[in-house]
Amino acid sequence: MDRKLLARRIAEESIVLLKNEDHMLPLKEKKEIAFFGRTQIGTLYSGNGSGGANVAGCGTILEECENCGIRPEPLLKGFYEYKINEERVTEEDEFDWTKVSEMVNSGIMYEIFGKYRAPLDEYEVPGTLIDQAAEKTDTALIVIGRNSGGEECDRHLSEDYYLTNSEESLLKEVCSHFTNVVVVLNVNGLIDLSWVRKYANIKSLLFIGIPGEEGASALAGILTGETNPSGKLAVT
């Protein structure tokens, strides 16, 4: 079997549908959806270090959803693309890659990359963009991401296992504007989910974990009904 087809099949059979009320999924064909969360573009495919993989050319969650006929609300899409690109340019400008070999030899690479790093804050979406999106669609999709832990940098409870303050704020804003909300968990470990009960608008909840190179494509197929999710949690 082709490597990409195998990767997609594994991802499809691993994604767990934790909640689906009022037949929220599959999404209606060509329905416009308000996408939120930095991980829709900064999609997490694999771990780091020895758990890392070559994911060059892999589609993001946003891209693969578009490929499957889901229409992202354009103003929000533009906002997130701008913020992500701005962040990438800043990081590239500030890092001197000519120093890498020197850093490895000195041991400072461990000091930089071998320590715990908290999840990145969610972007603060302007209220006007949320209002405008809510006028066009009643459905939103939020992607929550986690990519930390291992080798003396195990995850923390505050703002890691539990939601960050910026994630809490985003959820509150989205659930106060949209009747139907889908939450996708693109996380490398369990997180607290008690907050789901606080928001009746969260109709669907999907755990995709760190799904590999074809994970975003597999998720898009599930959201549109092309594939039925068949994954199970290890503890249930």
What residue ranges belong to the model's regions?
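C-terminal non-catalytic regions of proteins with extracellular/luminal or membrane-system context
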Residues: M1-T236
